[in-house]
Amino acid sequence: MTPLVLVHGGGHGAWCWEPLLAHLEAPALAVDLPPRSIRGGKDRHADVPELAMLTIGDFAASVLGDADAAGYERFVLVGHSMGGLTISEVARRAPTRVAHLVYVSAIVPPEGRSAIEAMPIELREPTRAAVDATRGGGANPVGGLDETALRFMFCNDMDEEQTRFVLDNAGTEVAVALAEPAWRAGIPPDLPKTYVKLLRDQSLPAELQDNLIANLEASPGGAVEVVTLDTGHDVMISRPHELAPVLNRIAAGPPDIA
C-alpha cells in the first residue's frame, strides 16, 4: 500500500491524527508543521517569532523533509482544513512524489487568492486583524481560540473525552500564511484528487465546502472524487473509523472516478 502523509490544519498538530492511526492499514506519517513548539503541549499558545515569518512554502518544505526522513519516496498526501494549502504546495513542488491528494474539509481558495478569501464571511475580518497584529509584532491569536469557540468549531459531534483531547492540545497558528496567495498551477490535472466533505462541519460549513470543491475542479482541473461523511470538522478525532476506510481504499490503489 502507498504510505500516507497526514497534514494537520490550523491550531492543530500531529496529535490530532492519533485516534486515526490505529485504523489505518498503510504506513502513515503524521507531521508537525513549523513552528513545532506550538503543536500541542505547554507552549501551544506561545507567541514565537516564526509566527510572523513562516509561509506556505515553508510548510511544504517541512512536509517533504519529513517524508524524506521517513523514507517515503511516493505517498498519498492528506490535508485537513488549513492543511489543504500545504498539500497543494507540496504537489506543486514535487508532483511525481504525490500519488493522490486528499482534502479533508480543507481550504482550497480560488487560484492565486488567500485562505482568508475562502473562509466563512464572519471569520474574514477577525482573521485579517490577527494577521495585521502578527505583522506588527503583536500577539497572534489565530488558533488560540477560547473554549466556547473550540467546542463550536471543532467538537460539535464529540463526546466529552474527545472534546477534552482537543481543548488540551489546540494552540495558536501562523496567521500570515492565511493572507498569502495560494496557488495550484503546476499540479498535473490528472493527479488523483479526493475531497472529503463533512456534513456537520461548523468550521467550514457544507455549502462552503461545495465552493472549495469547485475551486479545486477549476484549478488544477481534472476529476475530483467527493466523499461525504456525516461528521463535524475534526473527523479524525470524532469518527476515525469512518475516515479510515476512505484513506485505506485510496492507499490500496487508484480510485475509479469518471
Locations of the language-model features?
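Short, proline-enriched alpha-helix->beta-strand connector loops that line the catalytic pocket
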Residues: 2, 188-193, 222-224
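Flexible "cap/lid" loop of the alpha/beta hydrolase fold
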Residues: 92, 97-98, 102-138, 204, ...
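Conserved HGGG/HGGXW glycine-rich cap/lid loop of the alpha/beta-hydrolase fold
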Residues: 2-45, 66, 73
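Active-site loop/oxyanion-hole signature of alpha/beta-hydrolase fold enzymes
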Residues: 33-75, 92, 115-118
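Active-site nucleophile elbow and catalytic-triad environment of alpha/beta-hydrolase enzymes
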Residues: 168-187, 191
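Short beta-strand/loop motif that positions the catalytic acidic residue
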Residues: 195-197
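Conserved loop-alpha-helix segment in the C-terminal half of the alpha/beta-hydrolase fold
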Residues: 199-230, 245, 249-250
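Gly/Ala-rich beta-loop-alpha elbow adjacent to hydrolase catalytic centers
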Residues: 78-83, 87
